[in-house]
Design a protein with these regions (language model features):
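Terminal accessory carbohydrate-recognition/targeting modules of carbohydrate-active enzymes
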Residues: 1-184, 282-406
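Short, well-ordered alpha-helical packing segments
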Residues: 86, 102-104, 229-232, 249, ...
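Substrate-binding groove/exosite segments of carbohydrate-active enzymes
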Residues: 165-271
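Catalytic cores of carbohydrate-active enzymes
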Residues: 260-289, 307
Length: 406
């Protein structure tokens, strides 16, 4: 499931695995059906349906197999004209098709037809012809205006995806051997931006982690300050056994620093002293909660420690041995961050780093125990990983949907 909507607007919907659009407020869902040369194809009931989110952005591409090709649906939202969800259906086959939608409250270049044969659909459904190797574009208005003429010069799916990726990269950018990890990072950040963090009463730790991600992506910190302060107190009281508690309090401090609220930072310092004995022990498995997942990934690359930050604190994933990678803007406390790249020289990794903000003492206890540096930028040659031969291709071929640090 994918959340869609335009930032700055309140309209939201869920895109199902088969490309249906289910608004969160009291509006009818929009399903789609394809009439090909052989029969009607209903994506919800078809076995040969494949959906992807290129790069992790909330731009879905759903493919339905039809004779001699695919019907390819793309769904994405834009803020233009009061907010629109754009639906494209591309006919990749050499024969014409028709596409039916289960209600007619759509913007289109030409009106759809209500004459639908061969399939039973809800009253008010409409159908549009799509020529061979051509694309139909319609849109759903977020203001509920109903049917009308489709505006011209709307942003493209590719352009919208680029915008979401750029927003995610403001928080941190990861260029990893396992691309699925970076894609999921983008996806989870987009989900946070559209759906917001969990309620602090439900999970104060996740709330703080999520708010910090949003602020790092460009949201203003001030509206979050009262809830963040209360959530930090609640998390400290209730989360003593939570692996992410120290990172959540660190995240809260970054929000206060971004807002220039020194008093909140001082108050938080007292809270952090009360739980100073709580250690950050990263779980082996990736969390499912978006904010916790993002924190887990970043903390496996760089994590704040007393007086500094540790790079690759869980060690170098064996499947990354021999593969170059680089990461940018990982938080190390307050307004500080670190970027670093690993380049291989034979069996030995070389690290190049640059710190933003006040330089901290960097270390890599699991990868290079003897290495430490408080320089703002530099490079060093780390020892060869013990007992691990370089991987020629750089990473495992199949790491699954969530990526792999193994």
């Amino acid at each position: 499931m994918t959340t869609t909507g335009a930032l700055g607007g309140r309209w939201r919907a869920t895109i199902t695995e088969w490309g249906g659009i289910e608004p969160w407020r009291d509006e009818p869902a929009l399903q789609w059906h394809v009439a090909a040369d052989d029969r009607w194809h209903s994506p919800e009931n078809e076995a040969a349906v494949r959906q992807t989110r290129p790069g992790g952005a909330p731009v879905t591409e759903t493919r339905v197999r039809i004779p001699n090709g695919d019907a390819v649906q793309r769904v994405y939202s834009v803020p233009d004209h009061g907010g629109l969800t754009v639906i494209e259906v591309e006919n990749e086959s050499p024969l014409p098709i028709a596409v039916a939608f289960t209600h007619g409250r759509l913007l289109s270049a030409r009106p759809g037809s209500a004459a639908i044969e061969g399939i039973v659909l809800p009253e008010g459904s409409v159908v549009f012809p799509v020529g061979h190797h051509s694309t139909l574009t319609v849109a759903l208005s977020h203001d509920g205006r109903g049917a009308g003429v489709l505006p011209t010069n709307l942003p493209t799916a590719t352009g919208v995806a680029r915008g979401w990726t750029a927003m995610s990269d403001r928080a941190s950018r990861l260029v990893l051997p396992d691309e699925s990890i970076a894609d999921r990072v983008v996806a989870e950040r987009c989900e946070l931006a559209l759906a917001g963090p969990v309620h602090p009463d439900d999970d104060a730790v996740s709330f703080l982690l999520g708010v910090a991600q949003l602020v790092r992506m460009g949201e203003q910190p001030e509206p979050w300050l009262p809830d963040a302060a209360a959530a930090a107190e609640h998390a400290a009281r209730a989360g003593a056994n939570d692996w992410a508690l120290p990172l959540a309090l660190q995240a809260a401090d970054s929000v206060f620093v971004a807002a220039g609220d020194r008093r909140a930072s001082r108050d938080l310092a007292a809270v952090r002293r009360r739980v100073a004995n709580v250690a950050t022990v990263l779980p082996e498995s990736a969390p499912t909660d978006p904010a916790r997942y993002l924190t887990w990934v970043e903390a496996r690359l760089a994590v704040p420690v007393d007086g500094g930050a540790a790079l690759l604190p869980a060690g170098l994933p064996p499947s990354w041995t021999g593969a170059n990678f680089e990461v940018y803007g990982l938080p190390t406390g307050g307004a500080n961050s670190v970027s670093f790249a690993v380049r291989w020289h034979g069996e030995r990794p070389a690290v190049l780093w640059e710190q933003t903000g006040e330089p901290l003492l960097l270390s890599a206890p699991e990868v290079a125990p003897a290495w430490k540096s408080a320089d703002s930028k530099g490079e060093a040659l780390w020892p060869a990983p013990a007992g691990v031969a370089p991987v020629v291709d750089g990473f495992a071929a199949d790491a699954g949907d969530g990526g792999s640090f193994s």
